[in-house]
Swiss-Prot record:
EC number: 2.7.1.134, 2.7.1.159
UniProt GO MF annotations: ATP binding; inositol-1,3,4-trisphosphate 5-kinase activity; inositol-1,3,4-trisphosphate 6-kinase activity; inositol-3,4,5,6-tetrakisphosphate 1-kinase activity; magnesium ion binding
Designated name of the protein: Inositol-tetrakisphosphate 1-kinase 1
Record field: compositional bias (Basic and acidic residues): 1-16
Amino-acid positions noted as binding Mg(2+) 2 in the UniProt annotation, renumbered to this chain: 318, 320
Phylogenetic lineage: Eukaryota, Viridiplantae, Streptophyta, Embryophyta, Tracheophyta
Binding site for Mg(2+) 1: 303, 318
Domain ATP-grasp: 140-347
Sequence segments annotated as region (Disordered): 1-24
Subunit and interaction comment: Monomer.
Family: Belongs to the ITPK1 family.
UniProt source species: Oryza sativa subsp. japonica (Rice)
The reaction(s) this protein catalyses: 1D-myo-inositol 3,4,5,6-tetrakisphosphate + ATP = 1D-myo-inositol 1,3,4,5,6-pentakisphosphate + ADP + H(+); 1D-myo-inositol 1,3,4-trisphosphate + ATP = 1D-myo-inositol 1,3,4,5-tetrakisphosphate + ADP + H(+); 1D-myo-inositol 1,3,4-trisphosphate + ATP = 1D-myo-inositol 1,3,4,6-tetrakisphosphate + ADP + H(+)
Amino acid sequence: MRVHEEASEDKEREVEEAPDLMPLSPPLTAAATAAVVAVAGQRLVVGYALTKKKVKSFLQPKLLSLARKKSIHFVSIDETRPLSEQGPFDIILHKLTDKEWQQVLEDYREEHPEVTVLDPPNAIQHLHNRQSMLQEVADLNLSNAYGEVCTPRQLVIMKDPLSIPSAVAKAGLTLPLVAKPLVVDGTSKSHELSLAYVETSLSMLDPPLVLQEFVNHGGILFKVYVVGETIRVVRRFSLPDVNIYDLENNDGIFRFPRVSCATNTAEDAEVDPSIAELPPKPLLEKLGRELRRRLGLRLFNFDMIREHGRKDRYYVIDINYFPGYGKMPGYEHIFIDFLLSLVQNKYKRRLSGS
C-alpha cells in the first residue's frame, strides 16, 4: 500500500530477491529480434500516457538506453490533443484513471486495431474495485499437487460505520480484520489499510470499504510480477502475525500505509527458511497463466501469502495493474523483450494470414 505514492514505495524493504525468472515462453533470439525490428519499420514506437511519478519510476535511464539499442522509441502522449493526431504508434502504455481518457483510448482501439494497447481499459476496471478484484482468483479454485490458492473471506461495507459490527457478525467473519478502501483510484489513500482487533473498533472505520479476514503468514509476502508471459517473485516483509495476546490487549484500529512496509522491525528480523521459501514454480506458472487469461491483462502483479503452519495453502490478497516494475530486479531486459515479442507475434500472425 502507499502513503505518498511512488515516494513511499521507495521505502519498501526487500527480504530477498528471487534470483530466477519464470518464463512461460522462450526469450527472443537475436534473429527474432532483428526480424521484429524490421517489421516495425526499423524502430518500434511506444506511446505512453503515465503520471509524472510513474514516468520517473518506470522510464529509468537504463531502460531507455537498452530501448535505444533495440530501436525502441518511447513517445509521450499529449492528453490535450486528439490521440488520432499523434503517433503513429505500435504500442501504447497507459495508467491514467480519468474516465474521459479511458473512453478516448477505447475509441482509439476500435479505430486502430493494429495498435497494441497495454492494457484494455475495460479489463483494467476489474482491478479498480476490491469487490471484483479477487473474484477471478476465487472462481479459479486452483488446487494441485503443488498447493492450493485461495482468497480471504471478505465483506463489502458501503456505508454506515455503526452497522459494521452487526454485518460482520451476520457474515460470520473472524477477527482480526483487514480494512481496505473499496475503490482503487491510484491515490495514496486508496492503498492504505487498517487492522481491527475487536468488534467495538469496527464502527471507527470509514466506508465504503472491504473487510478481509486476516491470515497469519509469518510476516512474509510474495510479490509476483507478471510481464506478458514472464513472472518474477520478490519477497517482502508484511504485517506480523497476530496472537491471542494481541487480540486481548489491542482495542483500537491500527492503520498502515501499505502491507509491505507495515512493520518497523522487519529490517533486523531473522526469517525462518520455511516461511521465506518461495511458492512452487509450477503453482505460480499456472496461477499467472490463468489470471492473465481471465483478467485479459498482461501487465500486473499480485500479492500472495502462505498461511502460517500450512506449507501448501496460499492466499492472493491484492492485484495491481502496471505496478512499480522499477523495483523488480532486471525489469529493463524483461520489459524490452516483452515489447519486442508483441511485434514478433503480430508478424507471425501476418505471415500465417497471408
